[in-house]
Design a protein with these regions (language model features):
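Active-site segments that bind and position negatively charged phosphate/pyrophosphate groups
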Residues: 202, 206-323
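Short Gly/Thr/Asp-enriched flexible loops that form oxyanion-binding sites at enzyme active sites
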Residues: 52, 82, 101-115, 148-151
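A glycine/threonine-rich phosphate-anchoring loop and its flanking beta-alpha core
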Residues: 10, 113-212
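Short glycine/serine/threonine-rich phosphate/pyrophosphate-binding segments
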Residues: 19-23, 45-48, 75-78, 100-106, ...
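ATP/NTP phosphate-donor binding region
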Residues: 1-92, 337
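C-terminal charged capping/lid subdomain of soluble metabolic enzymes
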Residues: 304, 314-379
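Glycine/serine-rich anion-binding loops at beta->alpha junctions
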Residues: 90-106, 140-146, 276-279
């Protein structure tokens, strides 16, 4: 895919090799104080950290590190980041990594400009922040599409809730497929399934009559499936990396959701699973999706049949679900909680089910008892 720039509303720089030129241009637009945010040690091990710091120094920036952002970022980590941003009077937060780093920084950007706790501000006062520290994102692990929107998933450890919060849209995001070579293939596979999940969750939202958004969605799903297999077969396949990275962006930039009502119920169940187990997000979705779909597909059998025909090239709805399960096994994702090394007793399963928030949007509104049944089948 050719390099391009795009704004909707995040300013996107996309393409193989675009990283350095794009970052140099963007750094000219912001003040001297940059808070550099990242996750674990891979950024430094691969040398990308040193490259970015050198570019920041060359641009005359003062750099403050905010590292150690975990895969399921916590409210405590958000508060740590916002204190650092305030103390250093950051002019720009530069988030480097995958969805967890981006999610954390979107909320740090908002919390640093709020006097009250952002969790209470959004959930108790029912308000949405409007003032932010500018944010730039350099994507190294695609899949979540987090750089495309202002939503974030944050774990409140005290309340045992992993829930959406609303922060800033990034001012800019750099999507260079070459940078995904800095993360392990296991993470690439998990991220690609998260992309597929975003597309499926949107696709099965109301209305169930096929529209242009759904037709585009079908094409994105087919692309994810094809290019994930291609990349596993050949990790040097730059075209497949590019396609997966742009599919990730398409899954969450809002285009597929136009004209749709969605509840993302599989995500909401997995979020609470993550709140109690700190499990890998993409792997949790892989275990849940086929079992959940077998529970709900008869409530929208015609839509599931179309999905089977257009995405999986088979005739019947249940065949499509079987093919989804086959893909999960083929790419090496887990199919049970046991394979994820997760053990859930009845009390935890009930707690996950009771704390999962599902709003109307999908073809079947799940009850807590149905979620318990699904979780038990996932063991």
């Amino acid at each position: 895919m050719k390099r391009f720039d795009y704004e909707f509303p995040v300013r996107i720089h996309f393409g193989q090799g675009c990283f350095e030129d794009s970052l140099k241009k963007e750094l000219q637009k912001y003040g001297k104080r940059v808070m550099l945010a990242y996750g674990g040690g891979s950024l430094k091990r691969t040398g990308l950290y040193d490259r970015i710091v050198a570019m920041l120094n060359e641009a005359g920036k003062t750099v403050t590190d905010f590292g150690g952002i975990m895969p399921n970022p916590t409210l405590k980590k958000v508060q740590e980041g916002q204190l650092l941003a305030r103390e250093t009077k950051a002019d720009l937060i530069l988030a480097v990594g995958g969805g967890s780093v981006s999610d954390c920084c979107k909320i740090v950007s908002a919390q640093a400009r709020l006097d009250s706790d952002i969790w209470d501000y959004e959930y108790a006062e029912r308000k949405i922040p409007t003032d932010f520290i500018p944010l730039g994102v350099i994507v190294t692990a695609s899949g979540t599409g987090s750089e495309q929107n202002n939503g974030a998933v944050i774990t409140n450890e005290e309340k045992k809730l992993k829930s959406p919060l609303w922060g800033c849209f990034a001012d800019f995001a750099i999507l260079d497929p070459d940078l995904t070579k800095t993360v392990p293939m296991k993470q690439v596979i998990s991220g690609a399934f998260d992309t597929l999940s975003h597309c499926m969750e949107t696709y099965f939202g109301h209305p169930h009559t096929c529209n242009l958004s759904d037709r585009i969605n079908e094409a994105v799903q087919r692309s994810v499936i094809k290019n994930l297999k291609a990349l596993i077969a050949n990790p040097d396949d730059d075209f497949a990396r590019s396609e997966l990275m742009w599919a990730s962006a398409m899954g969450e930039n809002g285009i597929l959701k136009l004209g749709k009502v969605t509840d993302f119920q599989c995500h909401m169940i997995e979020h609470q699973l993550g709140a109690y187990t700190d499990c890998n997000h993409g792997q949790g979705l892989a275990v849940l999706h086929p079992i959940l779909y077998r529970h709900i597909y008869k409530s929208a059998e015609e839509k599931f049949r179309r999905w089977a025909q257009e995405v999986w090239l088979v005739q019947d709805a249940d065949e499509g679900i079987d093919f989804l399960a086959d893909l999960i096994r083929e790419v090496g994702l887990p199919t049970t909680f046991t394979e994820m090394c997760i053990s859930l007793d009845d009390d935890i399963i009930r707690a996950i089910a009771e704390s999962t928030v599902i709003t109307p949007g999908c073809c079947k509104q799940l009850t807590a008892d149905e979620i318990v049944e699904i979780l038990n089948e996932c063991k």
